[in-house]
C-alpha cells in the first residue's frame, strides 16, 4: 500500500518533461496528480482484476505490463554501540504509455524511475531524506529480470540470489549499504495477493510483503562509519489503477512485533475524514499463520497531532491500534516527530516504537498521506 501517491507523482513530473506542463502544478500536487493521472491513459495496460499465481523469485522482478510498481524497504538498525537508526529505500517504476515510443531519442522512453531514500538518525534527532527521478536509460536507471534488480544511478535494490537482497544508496554524506536475508515467509495481502482499493473493477493491485528480513551492513554519516544490524520489511506492489476520487489519503502501518508476529494495516480515508470500507491488512502470528483483516477488524485512535514547520501540514502523532481478533492493543509513538518528506510531495513516513501494556512490543513504520 505504501507510497501510492509517490507513484502518481511520477505522472506529474514526467508529463512536465514530455508535454511541458507548467512547473506550478507541483505546488499543488494533490490536485495535479488527479488531473494528470487522468491524462495518462490506462489503455493497453494489464489490470489487477482477479487472483493470480505468484512465482518467486520471478515476481520480485518488474512487471512492465502494469503501469506502476514499487520496491519498498524500511527497517530498524543498531550499531555496535547500540545507536539506533531507521531507514527507507523505495524505488518506483512508472509507464507513461503502454506502447513504446517510435522516437529515435532515448529521452523519449515512456518508463520513469523515482527513488526515495531516508535515514532517521534517532540519537542525533535528524531525518535525512533524498529524492531522485530519471527516465529509464542504459547505465542510468532501469530494471532487470534475472537476477531481479532496479536502480537509479548508484541507488540499487537487487537480489544476490533467489532469497537474498542487497540495498545501496548514498547522497550528501549519508550512505546505506545492507545485505538482507528473509526471516519470515512471503505474506500475500488481500485476497491471496489481490488487494482491492475500491468497488470499481480493476481498481486493485497485486500486493505482497516480506515482514521480516535480517539486515546487516553499514550506515555512513559524514565521516562516521557504523557497522549495523537489525531487521527490515519489504513491500511489493504493482497495479494500473490509482485510488478513487473519494479517497483523500491513507494511514499505513507496518509493525514487526517483539514476539515474532507482524501486523500490516492501511486505513483509506475519505475527504470527509471517514474510513473507507476497503481499508484492509493482515496479521501473522509467531507460527506464520495469517489472518486477513477488514476495515471493521481494526480500531485506530490518534493520540495527538504534530504540525510540520516545513509544510504547515498537521499530522496525527501517536496511535492506539486495537485488533481484537489477534488480541492486540498497541500504542505507537514516533521515534522522531519530524520524519516528513517535504520535497516535491509532502507526506510523513517514519520509524515508530510499539508498546503493549506498558512494555516494549516491537518496532514499525507508519506512512501518512493526504493531510
Write out the residue ranges for each language-model feature.
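Structured soluble/peripheral alpha/beta segments that form catalytic or ligand/cofactor-binding pockets
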Residues: 1-371
Amino acid at each position: 500500500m505504501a507510497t501510492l501517491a509517490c507513484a502518481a507523482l511520477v505522472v506529474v513530473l514526467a508529463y512536465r518533461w514530455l508535454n511541458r506542463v507548467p512547473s506550478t502544478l507541483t505546488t499543488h500536487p494533490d490536485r495535479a496528480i488527479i488531473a494528470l493521472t487522468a491524462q495518462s491513459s490506462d489503455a493497453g495496460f494489464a489490470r489487477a482484476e482477479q487472483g493470480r499465481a505468484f512465482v518467486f523469485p520471478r515476481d520480485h522482478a518488474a512487471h512492465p505490463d502494469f503501469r506502476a510498481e514499487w520496491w519498498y524497504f524500511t527497517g530498524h538498525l543498531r550499531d555496535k554501540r547500540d545507536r539506533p537508526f531507521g531507514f527507507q529505500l523505495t524505488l518506483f517504476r512508472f509507464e507513461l504509455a503502454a506502447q513504446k515510443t517510435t522516437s529515435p531519442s532515448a529521452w523519449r522512453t515512456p518508463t520513469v524511475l523515482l527513488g526515495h531514500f531516508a535515514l532517521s538518525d534517532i540519537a542525533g534527532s535528524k531525518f535525512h531524506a533524498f529524492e531522485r527521478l530519471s527516465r529509464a536509460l542504459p547505465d542510468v536507471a532501469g530494471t532487470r529480470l534475472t537476477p531481479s534488480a532496479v536502480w537509479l544511478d548508484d541507488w540499487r535494490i537487487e537480489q544476490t540470489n533467489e532469497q537474498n537482497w542487497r540495498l545501496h544508496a548514498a547522497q550528501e554524506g549519508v550512505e546505506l549499504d545492507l545485505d538482507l536475508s528473509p526471516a519470515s515467509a512471503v505474506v500475500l495481502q488481500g485476497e491471496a495477493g489481490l488487494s482491492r482499493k475500491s468497488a470499481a473493477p480493476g481498481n486493485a493491485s497485486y500486493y505482497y510483503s516480506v515482514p521480516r528480513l535480517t539486515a546487516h551492513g553499514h550506515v555512513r554519516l559524514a565521516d562516521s562509519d557504523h557497522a549495523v544490524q537489525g531487521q527490515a520489511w519489504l513491500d511489493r506492489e504493482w497495479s494500473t489503477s490509482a485510488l478513487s476520487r473519494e479517497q483523500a489519503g491513507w494511514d499505513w502501518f507496518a509493525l514487526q512485533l517483539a514476539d515474532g508476529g507482524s501486523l500490516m494495516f492501511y486505513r483509506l480515508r475519505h475527504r470527509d475524514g471517514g474510513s473507507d470500507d476497503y481499508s484492509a491488512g493482515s496479521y501473522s502470528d509467531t507460527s506464520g499463520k495469517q489472518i486477513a483483516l477488514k476495515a471493521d477488524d481494526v480500531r485506530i485512535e490518534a493520540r495527538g497531532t504534530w504540525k510540520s514547520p516545513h509544510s504547515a501540514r498537521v499530522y496525527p502523532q501517536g496511535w492506539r491500534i486495537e485488533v481484537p481478533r489477534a488480541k492486540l492493543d498497541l500504542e505507537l509513538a514516533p521515534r522522531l516527530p519530524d520524519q516528513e518528506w517535504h520535497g516535491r510531495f509532502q507526506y510523513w513516513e517514519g520509524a515508530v516504537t510499539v508498546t503493549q501494556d506498558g512494555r516494549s512490543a516491537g518496532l514499525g513504520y507508519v506512512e501518512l498521506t493526504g493531510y
